[in-house]
């Protein structure tokens, strides 16, 4: 005796409704051999649809045994059941259950997508099946463009896509007119002659008479099993042979590509909802990139503005502290202190510093200038550079020469009209003639003075003896050597100055402390604003989760159809995860573009007040963040979709 294709022994199915248990199927014994055409007939509520769901591995029996080719279905995992549906079973539904956003070919090839068949191969087979069923020229029509009979033919082609050894037809003519119904029944009869095993579920005896065997079910029990045709069965269709095994990488890439294609179709079908979902991500990512860019711009601007402080610089000024009202009357800070400091091993360079104001003239041009007296090491201590010329030598300082270095403001004010080089030119500083030997770079910042004023540097000895007639200086700047602990050097300098002065009539100003304090404040400010932007991004992420949950609810029926044609739980989860990630990545891209374009416009309008620097690590991080958001906030909706019961999903409309 041959092994039956389908065998049920004592199968029952019950459901819990509150505290009560409802028995839908009771003690079903059924055997269907390969190549049979069976009609299961019964009135509404008789249990015939539940029986079909169990036969199609969409549902599990509560009791008894169900075997397909001797394989106990009860022992199979959800993914194994999906494989069984995918490889052996094809469904034909009363209402077709086609994907509205896919073409006829796209709908037919869905089972082959989950069977990991190559794209070109499944396209060829889908087209051939449609041609065979009289739908040549309709390959790229969407379901809405097809009649009911044509849609049912597409459904039949889908059932045959992976072989269709067993075809389960649930009221296949229920939604068709009589002519289309006859055509569909003729197709099903022909498929049975070709060896397909057919099970038709119907309430219409006229439809049931087309089968060789009629099984009547009433109140969950089989009450009649009649053979209407005793002619020999056609040779049964052999199980669909396994497709050549493809590399895992190729399978994965193909599945991702198809999931991406389906995600794009779903997004396009709900464009407004997709745009609203993206909006939260767009503005969240734009906020993060903009804030980071503005923070980076502010940081660089701050660095430029405090760059004049130099590296490891300690400044000495008269007075016990910045609040000493008598600081202006203290005359004890003298050039000899700078000489003593220069002899210390931890000191790299030293320069006295003092300033005054004067009137500078060149030919018919004149301007008020800030005059700064410095030593030969001043430009080294402050880290300042020259655009042209040279700095002072120790000999020029010792001899109190009238050599001068001007800034770029002076060059533009006095020499821009003539276009000549300032080097070697003689200027009149009040009544003293000075010769220009250098021009400071345009981006030079001068400590303690306004950058929009004109500055001129002379040897401090020249200012002391020729301009001001005094012996004390306004300050001394000290640069410690590389690798020297700046805090320890500060303490040692304080001890040396106390020994020289006998009292603490000076104060120390450690520029590195200021630099670190400014940078720390800037960093703290950036972190705080970034956190605010991240909160906005998080809120947008919750929107993604919310919309994806809504999407799962709206597309429950679609999920059921995909499961019916063989989609694994992993396939469903991957589908919705990719959709969530795609939404977030697209939103991330738009957010970055919005931030860059908006930042450029903002910087152009605000100028140097609020500069924005594009931080490519931040841009890269934004994309990674968008991807992570899609995966994290899309996981729960995707998981919910993957865990849906196929029967419940299919019954959802």
From Swiss-Prot:
Cell inner membrane is among the record's keywords: yes
Protein's GO biological process: response to antibiotic
Compartment(s) where it occurs, according to its Swiss-Prot or TrEMBL record: Cell inner membrane
Entry's EC annotation: 7.6.2.-
Domain of life of the source: Bacteria
Membrane topology: Multi-pass membrane protein
Function: Part of the tripartite efflux system MacAB-TolC. MacB is a non-canonical ABC transporter that contains transmembrane domains (TMD), which form a pore in the inner membrane, and an ATP-binding domain (NBD), which is responsible for energy generation. Confers resistance against macrolides.
Protein name: Macrolide export ATP-binding/permease protein MacB
């Amino acid at each position: 005796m041959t092994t039956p294709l389908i065998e049920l022994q004592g199968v029952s199915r019950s459901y819990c409704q509150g505290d009560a248990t409802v028995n839908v199927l009771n003690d079903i014994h059924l055997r269907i051999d390969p190549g049979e055409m069976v009609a299961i007939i019964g009135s509404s509520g008789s249990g015939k649809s539940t029986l079909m769901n169990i036969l199609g591995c969409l549902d599990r029996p509560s009791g008894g045994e169900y075997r397909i080719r001797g394989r106990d279905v009860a022992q199979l995992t959800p993914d194994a059941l999906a494989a069984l549906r995918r490889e052996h079973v094809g469904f034909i539904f009363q209402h077709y259950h086609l994907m509205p956003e896919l073409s006829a070919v796209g709908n037919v090839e869905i089972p082959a997508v989950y069977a990991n068949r190559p794209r070109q191969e499944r396209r060829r087979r889908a087209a051939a099946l449609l041609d065979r069923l009289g739908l040549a020229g309709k390959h790229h029509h969407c379901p809405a463009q097809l009649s009911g009979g044509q849609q049912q033919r597409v459904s039949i082609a889908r059932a045959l896509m992976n072989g269709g050894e067993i075809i389960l037809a649930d009221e296949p003519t229920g939604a068709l007119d009589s002519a289309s119904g006859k055509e569909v029944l003729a197709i099903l009869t022909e498929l049975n002659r070709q060896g397909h095993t057919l099970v038709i579920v119907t309430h219409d005896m006229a439809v049931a008479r087309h089968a060789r065997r009629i099984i009547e079910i009433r109140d969950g029990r089989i009450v009649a099993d009649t053979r209407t045709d005793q002619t020999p069965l056609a040779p049964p269709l052999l199980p669909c042979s396994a497709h050549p095994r493809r590399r895992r990488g190729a399978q994965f890439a193909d599945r991702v590509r198809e999931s991406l294609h389906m995600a794009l179709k779903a997004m396009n079908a709900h464009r407004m909802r997709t745009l609203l979902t993206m909006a939260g991500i767009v503005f969240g990512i734009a906020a993060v990139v903009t804030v980071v860019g503005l923070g980076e711009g502010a940081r660089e601007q701050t660095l430029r503005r405090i760059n004049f402080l130099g590296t490891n610089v300690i400044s000495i000024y008269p007075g016990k502290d910045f609040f000493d009202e008598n600081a202006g009357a203290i005359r004890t800070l003298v050039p000899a202190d700078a000489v003593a400091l220069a002899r210390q091993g931890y000191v790299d360079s030293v320069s006295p510093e003092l300033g005054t104001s004067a009137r500078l003239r060149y030919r018919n041009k004149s301007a008020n200038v800030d005059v700064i007296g410095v030593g030969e090491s001043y430009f080294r201590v402050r880290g300042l550079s020259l655009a042209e010329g040279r700095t002072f030598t120790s000999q020029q300082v010792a001899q109190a020469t009238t050599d001068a270095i001007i800034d770029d403001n002076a060059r533009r004010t006095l020499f821009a009209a003539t276009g000549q080089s300032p080097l070697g030119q003689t200027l009149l500083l009040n009544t003293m003639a000075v010769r220009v030997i250098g021009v400071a770079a345009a981006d030079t910042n001068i400590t303690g003075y306004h950058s929009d004023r004109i500055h001129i540097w002379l040897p401090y000895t020249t200012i002391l003896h020729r301009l001001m007639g005094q012996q004390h200086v306004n300050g001394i700047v000290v640069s410690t050597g590389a690798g020297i602990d700046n805090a320890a050097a500060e303490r040692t300098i304080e001890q040396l100055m106390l020994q020289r002065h006998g009292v603490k009539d000076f104060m120390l100003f450690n520029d590195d402390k200021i630099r670190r304090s400014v940078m720390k404040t800037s960093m703290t400010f950036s972190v705080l604003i970034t956190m605010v932007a991240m909160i906005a991004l998080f809120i947008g992420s919750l929107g993604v989760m919310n919309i994806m949950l809504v999407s799962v609810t709206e597309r429950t029926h679609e999920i059921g159809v995909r499961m019916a044609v063989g989609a694994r739980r992993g396939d469903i989860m991957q589908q919705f995860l990719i959709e969530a990630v795609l939404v977030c990545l697209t939103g991330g891209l738009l957010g970055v573009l919005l931030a860059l374009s908006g930042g450029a416009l903002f910087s152009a309008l605000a100028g140097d007040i609020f500069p924005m620097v594009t931080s490519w690590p931040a841009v890269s991080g934004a994309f990674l963040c968008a991807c992570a958001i899609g995966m994290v906030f899309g996981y729960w909706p995707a998981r919910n979709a993957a865990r849906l019961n196929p029967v419940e999903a299919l019954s959802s409309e």
